[in-house]
A protein has these predicted regions:
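Conserved catalytic cores of very large enzyme subunits
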Residues: 6-13, 17-167
Length: 167
């Protein structure tokens, strides 16, 4: 049994999260992060996606959970960043599944080239930069890993602060 009370609490929270995701929609930022990982595993394991899979606009997907949890007082930026960094480590350590078919013939890589986009615009055309966008930039800086690949999407609506921070 785990004797470190902090680690024990983390493990218990992970177990509680598993009662929700992936069978149900996430209710918290942490659950949303876990769902991202499960979705990534499912796609890369089942679909053999030509060495690349983009989980999409992570900042856009996570912002509602981040805002709800920070407003409820159950999440701060330090914990939000830590959870992103844990996900980054998972992406980095996840080799792609065994290649088959044309993918086997054309590729000799062992990584799955996850690609994270941040910034850009929302589906309604508004500025898409949000608090999670900045956390993703912090994560990229802190982790300095070659995977997941990370892109910054810019538009005329992108704040100068975000552009400077991304560079």
């Amino acid at each position: 049994a785990e004797t470190d009370p902090v680690r024990k609490a983390e493990i218990l929270q992970i177990a509680k999260n598993l009662e929700v995701v992936p069978a149900h929609a996430p209710q918290t930022y942490w659950q949303a992060i876990q769902l991202y990982w499960f979705t990534h595993l499912a796609v890369t394991t089942e679909l053999n996606p030509w060495d690349a899979f983009s989980p999409g606009r992570m900042d856009q997907h996570l912002i509602k959970y981040y805002e709800a949890d920070t407003e409820a007082g159950i999440l701060d930026d330090e914990k939000a960043l830590e959870l992103l960094e844990c996900l980054w480590v998972k992406f980095y350590n996840q080799p792609a599944p065994v290649k088959v078919g044309i993918t086997l013939k054309e590729s000799a890589t062992y990584t799955d080239f996850a690609n994270i986009n941040t910034g850009g615009v929302t589906p309604t055309g508004e500025n898409g930069v949000n608090a999670v966008s900045y956390l993703i930039l912090d994560c990229m800086d802190d982790m300095k890993l070659v995977q997941p690949n990370s892109n910054v999407t810019i538009s005329k609506k992108t704040p100068q602060r975000f552009l400077r921070r991304a560079c």
